[in-house]
């Protein structure tokens, strides 16, 4: 609070800047290095979620940034607190998510002595953060926090790391608050849109690819109207399926792990690709084999909010520096040609998508994850948020789930294991009224599974589906491909995850047959508690189309 002389502690100034910039929620693990900041929260209307490990806190904040487009906020202590949180910072970097991580720091007079838990955060985070800094002068807090919000959200969004020396936080200073930040849009030029229309009019086999961040529900709706007018097939890139309604007749599917071969052929055979928001990195490009580098055979129009990515890998015939939200609005001014030579192909693309995703494949064992994911389509509301971490289990999720609205998919492009559980909790804290479900592998879950305690503490009834095949499945798959039959370090002995849930005060159930899943799911919903459904799946079921035995035998045969 302001004293009679108009001063506030630096910590109060800091938290007041968060209020000014519209922050309603922060995630943290407490530490003595920033106690003054914690105290400042006491008198301000910002909700705090206390987590059990800093990686969980950072991932929750990242998930909120991903869902809202505004910076997720995380506070952690110095040293090991910061290094634990680095996983979330890396996710924010590769997923283009706005995130601001505040880190406690040793007192200024102790720096460069390797004081207790001292680190140079500019050096530690310099390669994964958009900007890493340390505040020495409390009078500059409004300036630097404002810059952090603009940096995290501007251009290609990403993480900012700010170190807070503990002695600086208790200094008193008279300084005005900064104005509230307003996200800066990057609009395409009139000449860009004119050239795009000419290229579309000249095309015979165009396709649209959507990815990246800086989208909104309004932008997705505008893009859908554009696709309608031009009868364009639209695909989404890795873990960005929520950008286009899968029920839309123009939807052609998603480019990720184990994609539809017909979709890959359609992209390769296109004569024009309109790539909006994404980078078409290693995963959606199928290890950079989908397009020729540096000059694709197809006419490439690349729309991205940041010139540093335009031309970095692919030389586009038309490169447009624009945010997806601004570009989608500008699309309203484009008119289709009188004749659309590709019109008959778009329904075929959608039919290929439906044929690939409607009916789950048969897999070894009594639990078919594909049938479970497909069965949830009719049981989940359209605004349900579906989260997942990394592992082969996610191939079933991405293939058979239906993400009907923008913001209903939270999954890491970075491929970070342990993402799903904290992301689900963050989403539930952000929107308690929405259904939130997370899928996690057995190895995946135990990287951040302690955050289930956070869900119980805050009465956040997320439903976690743990897919237990008793191994690090993705690594085992590659191990069998390269070193068939030589199993090392990929087997797991797991606990009873249903009992684990009950031990924390949640709901837990074991599922050993597909038919038992949906009664257990309904019971979990009715319990009103955070829940874990423990699926015991056959380790032979590596993916919807590949078995462990077949993978090994193919490798042994030299295939």
Language-model segments: residues:
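Phosphate/pyrophosphate-binding active-site segments
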Residues: 1-6, 139, 175, 297-392, ...
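Active-site diphosphate/adenylate-binding microenvironment
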Residues: 11-15, 21, 32, 37-38, ...
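Glycine-rich phosphate/diphosphate-binding loops that line cofactor/substrate pockets in enzymes
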Residues: 12-23, 63-69, 93, 151-156, ...
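Thiamine diphosphate
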Residues: 32-108, 111-112, 116-117, 262, 264, 269-282, 395-472, ...
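Glycine-rich, anion-gripping cofactor-binding loops and their flanking helix/strand elements
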Residues: 66, 212-301, 402-433, 446-450, ...
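Glycine-rich, acidic loop regions that bind phosphate or pyrophosphate groups
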Residues: 103-144, 166, 240-346
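Conformationally flexible catalytic loops at phosphate/diphosphate-handling active centers
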Residues: 147, 151-202, 337-339, 357
């Amino acid at each position: 609070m302001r004293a009679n002389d108009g001063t506030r502690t630096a910590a109060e100034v800091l938290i007041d800047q968060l209020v000014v910039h519209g922050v309603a929620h922060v995630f943290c693990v407490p530490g003595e290095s920033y106690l003054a900041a914690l105290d400042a929260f006491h008198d301000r209307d910002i909700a705090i979620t206390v987590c059990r490990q800093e990686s969980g806190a950072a991932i929750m904040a990242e998930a909120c940034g991903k869902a809202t487009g505004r910076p997720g906020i995380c506070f952690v202590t110095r040293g090991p607190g910061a290094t634990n949180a680095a996983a979330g910072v890396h996710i924010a970097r590769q997923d283009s998510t706005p995130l601001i991580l505040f880190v406690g720091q040793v007192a200024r007079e102790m720096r460069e002595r390797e004081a207790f838990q001292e680190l140079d955060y500019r050096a530690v985070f310099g390669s994964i953060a958009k900007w890493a800094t340390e505040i020495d002068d409390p009078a500059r807090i409004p300036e630097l926090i404002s810059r952090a919000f603009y940096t995290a959200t501007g251009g290609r969004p990403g993480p900012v790391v700010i170190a807070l020396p503990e002695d600086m936080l208790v200094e008193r200073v008279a300084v005005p608050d900064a104005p509230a930040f307003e996200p800066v849009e990057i609009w395409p030029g009139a000449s860009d849109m004119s050239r795009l229309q000419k290229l579309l009019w000249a095309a015979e086999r165009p396709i649209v690819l959507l990815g990246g961040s800086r989208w909104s529900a309004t932008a997705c709706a505008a893009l859908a109207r554009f696709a309608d007018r031009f009868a364009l097939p639209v695909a989404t890139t890795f873990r960005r399926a929520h950008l286009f309604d899968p029920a839309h007749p123009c939807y052609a599917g998603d480019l990720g792990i184990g994609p539809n071969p017909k979709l890959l052929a359609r992209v390769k055979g296109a004569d024009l690709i309109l790539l909006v928001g994404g980078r078409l990195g290693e995963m959606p490009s199928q290890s950079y084999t989908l397009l020729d580098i540096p000059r694709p055979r197809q006419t490439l129009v690349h729309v991205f909010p940041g010139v540093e990515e335009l031309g970095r890998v692919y030389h586009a015939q038309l490169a447009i520096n624009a945010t997806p939200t601004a570009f989608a609005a500008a699309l309203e001014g484009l008119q289709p040609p009188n004749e659309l030579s590709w019109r008959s192909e778009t329904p075929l693309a959608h039919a290929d998508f439906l044929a690939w995703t409607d009916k789950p494949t048969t897999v070894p064992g009594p639990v078919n994850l594909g049938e479970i994911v497909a069965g949830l389509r009719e049981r989940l509301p359209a605004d349900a948020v579906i989260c997942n971490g990394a592992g082969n289990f996610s191939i079933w999720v991405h293939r058979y789930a239906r993400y009907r609205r923008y913001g209903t998919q939270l999954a890491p492009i970075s491929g970070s294991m342990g993402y799903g559980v904290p992301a689900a909790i963050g989403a539930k804290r952000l929107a308690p009224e929405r259904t939130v479900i997370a899928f996690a592998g057995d190895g995946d879950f135990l990287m951040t599974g302690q955050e289930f305690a956070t869900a119980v503490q805050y009465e956040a009834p997320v439903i976690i589906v743990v897919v237990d095949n008793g191994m690090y499945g993705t690594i085992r798959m590659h191990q069998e491909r390269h070193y068939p039959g030589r199993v090392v370090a990929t087997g797991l002995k797991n606990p009873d995850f249903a009992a684990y849930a009950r031990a924390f005060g949640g709901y837990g159930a074991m599922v050993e047959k597909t038919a038992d899943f949906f009664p257990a799911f309904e019971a979990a919903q009715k319990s009103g508690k955070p829940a874990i459904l423990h699926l015991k799946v056959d380790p032979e079921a590596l993916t919807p189309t590949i078995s462990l035995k077949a993978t090994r035998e193919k490798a042994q045969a030299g295939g």
